[in-house]
Amino acid sequence: MKKSMILGLAALMGVLTSCGQKAGAEAELHVIFDNPAPRTMPLSLFGEVPAELVQELGIAEGVPSSVSAVLVEKGGQQWLFDAGNGNDDSRLLPKMEELGVAAQDIDAVFITHLHGDHIGGLVKDGKAVFAQARLYVPAVELDAWMQMSGGAPQNVKEMVEAYGGRLVKFAQGDALPGGVEAMAAYGHTPGHMVYRTDDKLIVGDIMHGVALQMGHPEYCARFDMDKEKAIASRKAIVELAKAKGWTMYGMHFPTTEGIAVK
């Protein structure tokens, strides 16, 4: 597979280093921007951020972001982590095709959580887009959304119906294909998971604005459903990645490169 075009990430605070694939790494990973144009998160989404900090970080016009999915090739298998928005201008499938991977080539899709910008690309006209794939969804997450007052969101119900018996609910600690490890990182949503393959940590929505939240994890985006848990998860995952030397890849990072914490 071709390597993704490297898009640089502005220096965040001196604690980050952008880094690409390690030579000889077993898993080949590609971050795919689903959004067709550069994207920022409005600063207002993060509450009241002191003007001095805004100036220091250079984020007055918004926090650089993206809507992304992650494609991994390992051991002859093709895995997708989340599936983007599924909008008409989605870049996920076209970019996969550029990399030589068709939707029907995907063996497994792993979902971090059930927000629309992560599952919107799973279903088209009521049918599964990844027709040969098993869909792995955290049980805590799916159960929480299915039991919400007023019923499950339509896109969640469509996902369940479209994938049918190929939808696999799992709990932390369950064996997943290829040795993929799922770790609970609750707070953004009730059952948000991050995934590890080799030394690569796919962190979902741990951070929506990495330029702000990496150094200041106490700031939550409006989308975090349980802010106290989200802050705790954000701190824990970053510290874990630092301690283990794992590279983080996030669905709202503004770079196709991973980020290693120094």
Enumerate the predicted regions with their spans.
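Active-site HxH/HxHxD metal-binding segment of metal-dependent hydrolases
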Residues: G84-Y163
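Active-site neighborhood of phospho(di)ester-bond hydrolases with catalytic His/Asp-centered motifs
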Residues: L80-A83, D107-D117, Y136-P138, A184-G187, ...
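C-terminal motif of bacterial Sec signal peptides marking the signal peptidase cleavage site
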Residues: T17-S18
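Metallo-beta-lactamase
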Residues: R134-A184, K229-G245
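Active-site environment of divalent metal-dependent phosphoester hydrolases
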Residues: R39-T40, L114-G121, T189-M193, H208-L212, ...
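Conserved beta-strand hairpin/beta-sheet module of binuclear metal-dependent hydrolase folds
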Residues: G24-A27, F33-E98, V194-I206
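Cap/insert and terminal regions of metallo-dependent hydrolase folds
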Residues: Q21, D199, V203-K262
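Positively charged n-region of N-terminal signal peptides that target proteins for export
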Residues: M1-S4
